[in-house]
């Protein structure tokens, strides 16, 4: 009897101990009764029916991280690359996470790999490097929709490394080298072009300044010549005015004027004749003789100098011929 009582006491104590469940914060348990879902245990103190109830799933509701291994992908322009990613997710419905999919984390990894291959296959190689943010947003949206039936919320997806094959890397290196050389050649040609333009502009400005200087000099010369002619005209006008007054007031002024004109006429011929170069002068002997005779009548024969006498003799000889 005592043995039976002891056995009952141990069994009852064990049943009571297994029926008490303490759930930590941010954790949840799923309980089945006789093979079917019964209830969900929340953080705190919970009780179950011994033997009939069984905890079948324990999981946290905190955010978790899945490290996606490198995956081979083909871009839209048929370039082979490898890409890996990190996925941040958490369970929002414990019942769906257990009953809707058999192995939740494995299913998540395979789904992410499939989505990465799908999204990268829509882009060309250059776009995969420049549109990483857009790819992350697309992956997040697609994964969130696909995992919603599993009671999972995907909070963030980050592509980490996108690595082309070695052949593609070598080709990209050659392309970048060619681009750098092209940019250097363009910069050099632009510098030479700017230098030529600056030189041409400098020459043009110099020619403009030179032309303006010549123009100003020509204007100044013309103004000086104009002023000279004006002064000469004024002097001539004043001389003519004085001469007119003299001729009108003095009876002998006309004869003096004729003498001066005749003397200048003879001096002109003497000056031309003294030149070394040969020249031909067409003169009317009658005009010369009349001029000389006018001079002779004014000053008399004795007042003529030797040069004038020589000129008269030459004219006489010319007349005789």
Swiss-Prot record:
Location(s), subcellular: Membrane
Highest taxon listed in the record's lineage: Bacteria
Alphabetical list of InterPro entries matching this protein: Band7/mec-2_domain, Band_7, Band_7/SPFH_dom_sf, Band_7/stomatin-like_CS, Stomatin_HflK_fam
Membrane topology field: Single-pass membrane protein
Disulfide bridge positions per record: none
Keywords: Membrane, Transmembrane, Transmembrane helix
Gene Ontology cellular component terms for the protein in this record: membrane
Pfam families the record matches: Band_7
SMART domains according to UniProt: PHB
Transmembrane region(s): 3-23
Family, as annotated: Belongs to the band 7/mec-2 family.
Protein name per the record: Uncharacterized protein slr1128
Organism whose genome encodes this protein: Synechocystis sp. (strain ATCC 27184 / PCC 6803 / Kazusa)
